[in-house]
Amino acid sequence: MRRFVVVGHRAVTTPKFSLNDLPGGAGRMDIIARCVNASLFLSHDLRRDVEFFAILLGEPTPPVTIKFSGEHVRYLSPDERSPAALIKKALERGIPVEGEAEATPGVYISKRSFADLINGMDNLVYLHEDGEDIRSVELTGNETFVLSDHQNLTPEEEAVLEAKGAKKVSLGKKLYHADHCIVMVNWETDRR
């Protein structure tokens, strides 16, 4: 199972956002939506062997983790509004006190923090421009790739990854959009 974890540092944790203003009023939820699509979509199909996690850290009640399961997700279309609408529905459903709850088929919501989520995962790969070139790294297809939205991970978040022994891997020396990084990782992994 391939996993992607994206931290949305400003992505709101309330359902009271407009699907017409994902970059502004929703705290860059547009980035999260594009990352969902980059993770899961193929031409005319979904990647059933991929899970996507968005850690929403915006106001008013961070953290909230939303999980999309490629195997089980329904009602997802390849546009920004569709995954954002599913996130909105999950937030409307409410955040469970413990564990995770299925909000819509294949979309789950929980109160897990970045540290909680990362500490429960293995084979961590931190995508960072200063890492080892991805083409020289052995990939099994069972990695968890961690990246951030338009902001860098905080030193505290990086410390969590370091404590778990995450490999720092680079897609190149340039900075790319998060969703583009996910497409490149999927392409690179598919070729092996």
From Swiss-Prot:
Pfam families found in the cross-reference section? Methyltrn_RNA_2
List positions binding S-adenosyl-L-methionine.
127, 181
CDD domains with a match to the protein in the record: TrmY-like
Q: Which cysteines are joined by disulfide bonds?
A: none
E.C. number, please? 2.1.1.257
- Gene3D superfamilies, per database record: 3.40.1280.10
Its subcellular locations are: Cytoplasm
Give the record's keywords alphabetically: Cytoplasm, Methyltransferase, S-adenosyl-L-methionine, Transferase, tRNA processing
Q: What class of enzyme is it?
A: transferase
Q: Which cellular component terms (GO) are annotated to the entry?
A: cytoplasm
Its recorded reaction(s) are: pseudouridine(54) in tRNA + S-adenosyl-L-methionine = N(1)-methylpseudouridine(54) in tRNA + S-adenosyl-L-homocysteine + H(+)
Q: List, alphabetically, the InterPro entries matched.
A: Alpha/beta_knot_MTases, TrmY, tRNA_m1G_MTases_N
| A molecular-function term among this protein's GO annotations | tRNA methyltransferase activity
GO aspect biological process, one term: tRNA methylation
What the record says about family reads: Belongs to the methyltransferase superfamily. TrmY family.
How does this chain assemble?
Answer: Homodimer.
Q: What does this protein do?
A: Specifically catalyzes the N1-methylation of pseudouridine at position 54 (Psi54) in tRNAs.
Q: What is this protein called?
A: tRNA (pseudouridine(54)-N(1))-methyltransferase
Q: Which organism is it from?
A: Methanocella arvoryzae (strain DSM 22066 / NBRC 105507 / MRE50)
Q: Which gene encodes it?
A: trmY
